[in-house]
Amino acid sequence: MQEYIHVKGAREHNLKNIDIKIPRDKLVVFTGLSGSGKSSLAFDTIYAEGQRRYVESLSSYARQFLGQMDKPDVDYIDGLSPAISIDQKTTSQNPRSTVGTVTEIYDYMRLLWARIGTPHCPKCGKEIHQQTIDQIIDRLMALEEKTRVQLLAPVIRGKKGEHVKVFENARKQGYVRMRVDGEIHDLSEEFKLAKTKKHNIEIVVDRVVIRPDARGRITDSVETASALSGGLVIADVIGGEPITFSQNYACDDCGISIEELTPRMFSFNNPYGACPVCTGLGIQKRVDPDRVIPNRHLSIKQGAIRASGWGNADTGSIAAMYYNALGKKHGFTLETPIEEFSEQALDELLYGTGDEPLELSVSRISGGVMRQPFEGIIPNLERRYRETNSEWSRGEIEEVMSESPCPACHGRRLRPEVLAVTLGGLNIAEFAEKSVVKAMEFLHTLKLTEMQHKIGDRVIKEIMDRLGFLQSVGLEYLTLSRSSGTLSGGESQRIRLATQIGSSLMGVLYILDEPSIGLHQRDNDKLLATLGRLRDLGNTLIVVEHDEDTMFAADHIVDIGPGAGRNGGEVVFEGTIDELLKSDKSITGQYLSGKKFIPVPEIRRKGNGKSITVKGCAVNNLKHTDFTIPLGTLTCVTGVSGSGKSSFVNEILYKKLAAELNGAKTRAGAHDEFIGIENLDKVIDIDQSPIGRTPRSNPATYTGVFNDIRDLFAKTADAKARGYNASRFSFNVKGGRCEACAGDGLLKIEMHFLPDVYVPCDVCKGRRYNKETLEVRYKGKNIYEVLDMTVDEACEFFANVPKIARRLETMREVGLGYVKLGQSSTTLSGGEAQRAKLATELSKRSTGKTIYILDEPTTGLHVADVHRLVDVLQKLVDAGNTVVVIEHNLDVIKTADYILDLGPEGGDGGGRLVVSGTPEEVAQCKGSYTGQYLGPILARKNGGKRDK
């Protein structure tokens, strides 16, 4: 086997004909500045070629489902293994996807509960056992005399197919009727079932009338039905509810029977297991009273009621007619604040008067009074939501709805009879609600009978192994019931990493994108040990990473640079960590060796004397915790993964401020009191979401500098002579753009079974504008050539235009100098998008009363980029604003004015404020994991070699 993966002539994106040998079966780190070409080499070249070769080895039939993969721009790659990419894309936004289902642990749980679980009656809780034929007969004979009953044998339950043989066998046995999907069919008829749909088929064994002398006949029919179906009998009571009997399990006291336990009954994605009310989602969208009336200080006349169709309180409106009638009954007017309504008045306003009529004044119609019950605002909205076919109407009503746990299953997703099956005293949903650590403890101490051991030991081992893999990547705080859509990119990636460890493959090439993101320094060792295990199995790991611990643990390091964009794309350094520390060419090496460093501020800001205090925070695992943030400071919220940082900052702090200051329709998580909002005028969340979702959006349009550039072109002598205004230089409207491609510069060719192909427009040659518009020039450049400039080039080009130069300089300050002005927003990384947002904010006039919130802004950033980011954040604070950052990166934490450290652990063991204060104060706290790692960094102060 070859010792190296040899990449020759890699030219994808900004790569400059790279020729490199990567050692196999080693942990290899690719590092370098953001935008230098690391991902282009790792993902777009090496992984893409590995995947393409694998797909090409499949049959043409299989390839049509996987899509055509383009060959990356590379001469050749030797020594390539099958490649698996583990990136930071969140696992799934499907509300049915959970940590348990993604890791396949839930599949083993379903098998375990189905095979060795103990069923109970969902009504009385008593253990239930199999029913005998005599017990079934006694239950039927207890029905009221002369009751007509149809006895059915369910032979097919929820299975796809045409089931021709089932019908043939029934005919041969002399049966004349069958119930198919709820409808009775005569077997003499010819009918065909849809092959791709699931069906329920029951043989009609007998139709009987309950009488004392019919016992013998009923007994024969029940025995026959039971034999046909394998123990199940359905008694379809005419004019009543059908009764299912089982020779497997039934409650003597309540007369409730359940089927024999099968794994599919424990799946919330299967109709046989899912709660019938919420269909297995665990949540329901319901109209929220607090959204219908968000401000109870207002009166109806002042617009207190924000619901669709109920906001108009003008005289003569239908809504006002009901409001006046209710007011007459309860003694309020339309000018009375809602908070002064009696409890009954508010209840009837929201939920209606039931059958009790109101006296409605309808003088404008008939000159009299009409008596009619009031449906209530909430029932009215929910009825309209169910009945309407209009997407617009549904959207209007959804604005006052919120998700709440299903009232039937209380968020547990399953049917009552399934939730009544226990193992060790827990049902499957209660077990899924435990954290990984607690679940392992439960299984470790689970007491089973000898028979249960024989059946369940192998299944329990599989579950324990997978839980152990999750623990090994620092995810011990997650619960198996947690929705996949709520996981961060880093958590999703580590779940996939844990799944790969479980597969125990060898000879594979794994390519990972910053697996340390979202991970506290304390948990880094676990992650590195996990990566080491994958390597020791005989795999090659290529890790795109900026984390210094990972670099020190690597067998081989490749530094791509020296700059970003067109200034990058070269191999600056490759070798061991010791060689990197001595390298003068590598910026990474200079920071790791301490020659370059992010300085610790000499003075910590005390703030402007004002603060925000949030009391009694109780979202997720927060333990009614109080937090205070001094305004006019850079505040870092720290703590181990799962300690409650995002719960406080994103769910309470941001959502409350957005609702109060920005008028957003967000609803803050549970808390008791929020003090100090009056000290702020707006809140801005600067996240890593894309700055635009279409190719038309670019950094120039997002930051607003393109408006100024278009104005400048419109003022040129040539433009004035032709009568062109600023809109002529827009590629979004007709006039100056190329109409053949509608200003995109590209044409989409639909290939049907293959991916769509984009080709440059043959009219404008990809330049987006028509010929006449491109003839207008400023300083020798037309509008397309300006958009094709990098920010650095544009800074020099527009140096004499202060308005444009100021915005461009801000973009350069945040590290976007290498990005082209017209580069499509869809091609920007999350870190680049975030810096574009920061540049936009920096270029605005500051009020000094803005609070900026950032969640792990160092994601995807090299230490040199982090240095630049810290400078930008400090500038925002210097302007009088407040910056709150959730962060694990010690280089950012050490520059903060104030720290809120949550923990001490993740999950149930977190949710408390361990310590708050300056970095120096936090470093002295022995109970703080953050403090333990921060101490040595502060002691090193400015520069000095990192201890390792």
Identify the function of each model-found stretch.
Residues M1-K948:
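Conserved phosphate-binding elements of NTP-dependent enzyme cores
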